[in-house]
Design a protein with these regions (language model features):
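A short acidic/basic microdomain associated with nuclease active sites
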Residues: 88-134
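Feature for intrinsically disordered/low-complexity regulatory segments and propeptides
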Residues: 1-82, 86-93, 97-105
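Intrinsically disordered, low-complexity regions enriched in serine/threonine
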Residues: 1-36, 115-344
Length: 344
């Protein structure tokens, strides 16, 4: 088995010291702006790339209806997470955020209320994006796993649809995951222990603190060990077909049966993508001898998630992809696993 040492391993927990930081909401807004991004996107489906500059300058900020208090903007969320990552890993290289958005909400200023949409001038139109996701990589912390270079990565997701903007200012919901990105394909490797799906915050400073705590508790070495373990097992074509068939069947099971099986969030369209890429994927397709490693199987799922998930479900499905793959691997080892149903 490959060594599980992370290179380099040195970092200092920053939670206590960072609590003394003040005015974090102001300092993080001036994060360096992305001017051009030629990297492969970490999520593709139903989303478009945007720069931090555009988020800051071209988008309005929604308010809570009953007290007119502003929400935490997308750029503030990105800035708080970016600053926490820089402070936690002080001696490492931190890449610029890669940002994706979807579900644009358009509006107009009051003076243009009676104009037709075709008559609106640029300064009379407003917009913001309901959903936003960003990815920040740390390329100096990496590990080679099953022949692929993985680099440390943090992903944040925000959907204003999760907040009650019709009420008064209250804690807003954010999701953050720390894990790895496969540099071969830019698939995210998210583990449930590095994923916080319901962070509540009313200021960028609170997001900053939540991010530091998540980074401090994340067990990087164990995550790498689990990912490496997937390379030790192989699926025959018959086993692969059986598992995909059970995945298709899962969502149609009677509730009494489904309750006895661990949750699976892989959709029918994702299953179709995995089947299609079984022979076609340049990096993770079946070998000439007809075998597919569980590592390759896992990456086919994360690739399908990258190409087929909406922003607001992206992290849930990515984390579930690893949970499901590890569970099936346990079943293949004849261990007591609730996932045995998928291979029997």
């Amino acid at each position: 088995m490959e060594q599980t040492t992370i290179i380099p391993p040195s970092y200092l927990p920053m939670v206590v010291e960072a609590e003394q930081t003040t005015n974090i909401g102001e300092t993080i807004i001036d994060a360096e702006i992305i001017t051009e991004d030629t990297r492969s996107p970490f999520i593709e489906a139903n989303s478009t790339a945007i720069t931090l500059e555009s988020l800051q300058n071209d988008c309005v900020i929604p308010n809570f209806a009953k007290d007119n208090e502003a929400v935490i903007s997308h750029s503030q969320f990105i800035g708080a997470t970016y600053q926490a990552l820089k402070d936690f890993y002080r001696n490492e290289q931190i890449d610029e955020p890669q940002i994706r958005v979807s579900h644009i909400i358009r509006g107009r200023i009051p003076e243009a209320i009676n104009k037709k949409s075709s008559e609106l001038l640029p300064h009379e139109m407003t917009q913001y994006y309901e959903r936003m996701a960003f990815c920040i990589n740390v390329p100096t912390i990496y590990q080679d796993v099953n022949g692929n270079r993985l680099q440390l990565s943090i992903v944040g997701v925000k959907s204003y649809g999760r907040d009650n903007l019709n009420g008064k200012l209250t804690g807003q919901k954010f999701s953050i995951a720390v894990g790895f990105q496969n540099t071969v394909c830019c698939n995210q490797c998210i583990w449930t222990d590095g994923y916080s799906d319901d962070i509540r915050a009313i200021s960028p400073g609170e997001i900053y603190q939540h991010t530091l705590r998540l980074l401090d508790t994340y067990d990087m070495a164990k995550h790498i060990y689990l990912l490496q373990s997937l390379g030790d097992l192989y699926l025959s074509e018959t086993q692969f077909a059986l598992i995909l068939g059970k995945m298709r069947l899962y969502n149609y099971l009677p509730q009494r049966i489904q309750r006895g099986i661990p949750e699976m969030l892989i959709t029918d369209s994702m299953v179709n993508s995995v089947a299609r890429q079984y022979y076609r994927d340049p990096n993770f397709r079946v070998t000439d001898s007809g075998e597919l490693s569980m590592w390759d199987f896992y990456n086919l799922i994360t690739g399908a998630c990258k190409k087929g998930c909406y922003i607001d479900t992206f992290l849930d499905r990515q984390a579930n992809a690893l949970t499901t793959s590890l569970g099936i691997a346990e079943g293949l080892r004849d261990e007591d696993s609730g996932y045995s149903w998928f291979i029997s």
